[in-house]
A protein has these predicted regions:
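A short helix->loop->beta-strand "cap" motif at the edges of active sites that frequently abuts
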Residues: 21, 79-82, 116
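Hydrophobic residues in well-ordered beta-strands that form the structural core
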Residues: 4, 25, 85-86
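Conserved core segment of the aminotransferase class I/II
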Residues: 114-182
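Conserved PLP-anchoring active-site segment centered on the Schiff-base-forming lysine
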Residues: 1-13
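Short, solvent-exposed loop/turn segments at secondary-structure junctions
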Residues: 9-10, 57-60, 90-92, 96, ...
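Active-site phosphate-binding strand-loop segment of PLP-dependent enzymes
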Residues: 30-99
Length: 182
């Protein structure tokens, strides 16, 4: 079961419906700050959540998770051994601070500071104002990339999380990327 922290991108839930996968969801609006920990644990302690998905900032409400909330998510992801898929489609577009200078603070807030169980999803289409065809980047922590999971081995015939993600899942779903987006 995948847990969505909403509001988020509704197509992600639709993708799970198409694949026949289960998901649960809650709206973060009433669970900001320390309240987030208790809410997340109410789901995670059941033991059936394999991943947490959220957008930061999100569309359409533009709620931005704070560092403390990202720390809570990261620490609980480690404690309960779940993977965080952090959708950064609007990477560095929280204009309350200037995130536009590469390699200089301040940096894009991310759960990657607080856990090794992460996949960051970054939209190249939005970052480069590229309308039309879509292209993005997935960033997997080294630890998660090299980790083996019995379920993945059973379904895909072996490999680590990273190799299955790239060579089995991502390639099969995208068949590469369009020439113009490259």
């Amino acid at each position: 079961t995948i847990l969505f922290i909403d509001p988020g991108f509704p197509v992600q839930k639709q993708q799970l419906v198409v694949m026949g996968q289960k998901f649960e969801t809650f709206d973060v609006y009433d669970f900001r700050g320390d309240k987030l920990k208790e809410k997340l644990e109410s789901y995670l302690k059941k033991g059936n959540i394999s991943a947490i998905v959220y957008s930061n900032p999100n569309n359409p409400s533009w709620i931005c998770l704070k560092e403390e909330e990202l720390r809570i998510i990261g620490e609980l992801a480690t404690q309960y051994d779940v993977i965080v898929l952090e959708d950064l489609a609007y990477f560095a577009m929280d204009f309350r601070q200037d995130l536009s200078k590469p390699f200089q603070a301040p940096y894009q807030p991310s759960v990657a500071h607080y856990t090794d169980n992460y996949v960051l999803l970054i939209s190249g289409s939005k970052a480069f104002s590229y309308a039309g065809q879509r292209i993005g980047v997935s960033c997997i922590s080294n630890k998660l990339y090299h980790r083996s999971y019995p379920g993945l081995t059973k379904r895909y015939g072996g490999g680590t999380f990273g190799t299955v993600f790239i060579h089995r899942v991502l390639y099969a779903l995208s068949s590469g990327t369009s020439h113009s987006a490259q």
